[in-house]
Amino acid sequence: MPAKDKRKDKRKDKRKGKNKGKEPKKIIKSDEPAIERAKANASLWEARLEVTELSRIEYRDTSRRLAKNNEDLKKQQYNMEKDIMSVLSYLKKQDQEKDNMIEKLKQQLAKTKEKAQEEKEKLEQKYALQVSELEGQFHQKAKEIGMIQTELKTIKQFQKRKIQVEKELDDLKENLRNSEKNYQETLRRLESRFFEEKHRLEQEAEKRIIMLAERAHHEAVVQLNTAGRNVFKENVYLHKALAYHLKEAEILQQNSKKIEENHSCLLQQKEINDLLVKEKIMQLTQQKSQIQTLQKKVVSLENALTYMTTEFEAEVLKLQQKAIIENQAGLVEIDKLQQLLQMKDREMNRVKRLAKNILDERTEVEQFFLDALYEVKQQILASRKHYKQIAQAAFNLKMRAACAGKTEYPRIRTFDGKEQSTNSVNQDLLEAEKWPTTQKNVDIRDLTWEQKEKVLRLLFAKMNGFAARKYSQSSKPPVPDHIIYGSGEMKETGDENNLLDQTFITQQAPVSDSNRMVSPDVIPQGLQDSDIA
């Protein structure tokens, strides 16, 4: 409604201005009375007064609304920044503690890994030495077992040879017995033959002697003359027979001597064989005792080898179990560290989301302030345009009245904004930016739009922790207490462009002064409509 009233008033003022440009001629021509001019002037000033009152009321309402919004936003911003700072400090503290804990855990893990590696190397060296010693012992025992096996082979060969020798001895004994038996039989047979022959020869000799005696007796009886000759012949024959028998007896004696010699040789061989048998029996008993001792030694060595192998396998199993337990413990520690890292990642992601939400909320607040600043600039432009129109209309009225001869001519005013002008409307507009009073408690509804813009800029600077822009001594504004967040003076700086470029942290929006405009494309249409309404 106030905007429509403004437009209607503007149209009326334009029509009145046009009509009033023509009225002086009519007044000069028609010579109307001064009362009508006074009424017209009064109605004009009443209209101007109404317009200014309406605009003042509208500006006051808008300034009150903006002050209230600014106050609420200031409180929200303060609480939000306080919460953000506390949350961020707490999160940073937690992050630092967790980083320290992670670093300690990493160092502890590295130390445990190094310690486990050293213990593993020591155990490997220790058990490598034990394995090498056991392998040396094993090789030594294997050599001893090989020697024992070779001895066993020789013993087996000796047993085989023994069996053969025993068989040979048995054969020799059998042959000796058979030869002795044959010798005894041949000796007995020869003796029997000798005695038989001797007996036969004796019998034959007796028979012949008897026969010869009888024959000789008969022949002697028959032929005594030829008796001597026959006896001689018979004697010669007997001598020959006796020599033959003696020769046979010698041969038989020689044969008996040979048989006796053979018998003595056989007896000697028998004795030698008995001695060899006894010696072999002694060797066999010694070898049997050696075999028994070697077998006992082999059994003891096998038992020792089995015991050492079982002990070595038990040590290997213990080492494997210990290594498995250590690996499981290391895996458990690694799982714990991974879970801790995952928790850390989740917390970091949560912190990132929280920071993103905080930044989004901050950008929303900053966007709201940008919208407010843009609205203030639009209001500044509209109010300046409206002021220029009113000032130009008033100047035209004064000029018409002066042309009519009612008043003096006013000072010449320019409305194009040239720098050479001494009485320009822009000077009045620049005066609106100054602070006319220096009181402490100032209501924001009583401020002009230019002063409100400066307040917003100071609010942005305080919000983002930047120094306020440098003011001249004449135009330095005493900012009200209910607008400033902290106590103390603002730091002055001469670089206005840096302040304008660094108005926001999260978005570098180019906020210009009254000559530079913020692009309305950045501002949502709903916010523009709500702020303008």
UniProtKB/Swiss-Prot annotation:
Thylakoid found in the keyword field: no
GO biological process, one term: cilium movement involved in cell motility
Chain coiled-coil ranges: 34-207, 246-368
Tissue specificity statement from the Swiss-Prot or TrEMBL entry: Expressed exclusively in the testis and predominantly expressed in male germ cells.
InterPro entries assigned to the protein according to its UniProt record, in alphabetical order: DUF4515
Entry GO CC: axoneme; ciliary basal body; sperm flagellum
Keyword Cytoplasm annotated: yes
Gene null: resulting phenotype: Mice show reduced sperm motility and male subfertility without obvious sperm morphological defects. Abnormalities in sperm flagellar axoneme seen, with an absence of one to three microtubule doublets in the principal piece and end piece of the sperm flagellum. Motile cilia are normally distributed on the epithelial cells of the trachea and the axonemal structure of cilia is intact.
Disordered: region residues: 1-30, 507-533
Protein name as annotated: Basal body-orientation factor 1
Gene name of the encoded protein: Bbof1
